[in-house]
Amino acid sequence: MPASLFIVRATIADPAKRAAFDDWYRKDHLPWAVKAFGARKAWRCWSDTDPSWHIATYQFPDRAALDRGTTPEIMKPLVEDFDRVWPGIPRTREVMTMVEEIGAS
């Protein structure tokens, strides 16, 4: 089974808020989300193309595990907490299936 990825992009338009957002996401949100989702692992990045974009990626062993981990019941408290702490921050969510992975030869 190919791995599935759940990708969340948040746009932090105000540069003055990015350090606080980064700290909160690292200490509070990411550990909670990984545990709640049952993700295999997670990582996050700030875009060099658009510095306002924060992208968090959660990896699951397969699509069924992703679907079990991101039900509305599991997502609701995470979304509510995000909206409470960071009101008005737009987000997008994507589900992707890995189709190929190669390493250097």
Each predicted region: which residue ranges?
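Macromolecular interaction modules
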Residues: M1-S105
